[in-house]
Design a protein with these regions (language model features):
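Short, conserved beta-strand element in jelly-roll/cupin
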Residues: 49, 58-74
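A short hydrophobic beta-strand segment most commonly corresponding to one strand
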Residues: 89-92, 104-113
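Short acidic-glycine-tyrosine-enriched beta hairpin
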Residues: 78-95
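Conserved short histidine dyad/triad with adjacent acidic residue
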Residues: 40-59, 93-96
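A short, N-terminal "cap"/entry segment at the start of jelly-roll beta-barrel domains
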Residues: 1-43
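Short beta-strand His + acidic residue motifs that chelate non-heme Fe in jelly-roll/DSBH
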Residues: 56-57, 74-75, 92, 97-104
């Protein structure tokens, strides 16, 4: 990720329209903003997983994820399970370990990719 051509800007996440994304179970509500030029666009999201959410796909995209509330587990393709609780983050590169997330009680995340 190269951060360039982004002027100083603030985001009031409560004004960003929600997008609903169904999981294998539960849903994820995304509030999304894009920054920077098209060829190097950075996606910034506030994401809320409902209780019982389980992702419907394996992801190979790189992310920086900060858990703001709740907790979730991310399962890696090799079988490892990584817990993420409020105040914790994880970082993974594009094309690195495929991962898939789930939560029992729900979680609120701040994600940059």
């Amino acid at each position: 990720m190269k951060i360039s051509d982004i002027p100083f800007v603030t985001t009031d996440w409560s004004t960003v329209p929600p997008e609903r994304h169904a999981g294998d179970s539960g849903e994820a509500i995304w509030r999304v903003q894009y920054f920077g030029p098209e060829e190097n666009r950075i996606r910034v999201r506030m994401v809320e997983y409902s209780p019982g959410y389980s992702a419907d796909h394996w992801c190979s995209k790189g992310h920086i994820i900060l858990c703001l509330e709740g907790e979730m587990e991310t399962t890696l393709a090799d079988g490892r399970v990584m817990p993420l609780r409020a105040g914790m983050s994880y970082q993974v590169a594009d094309g690195a370990e495929a991962h898939r997330s789930a939560t029992k009680a729900g979680a609120k995340l701040f994600i940059v990719d």
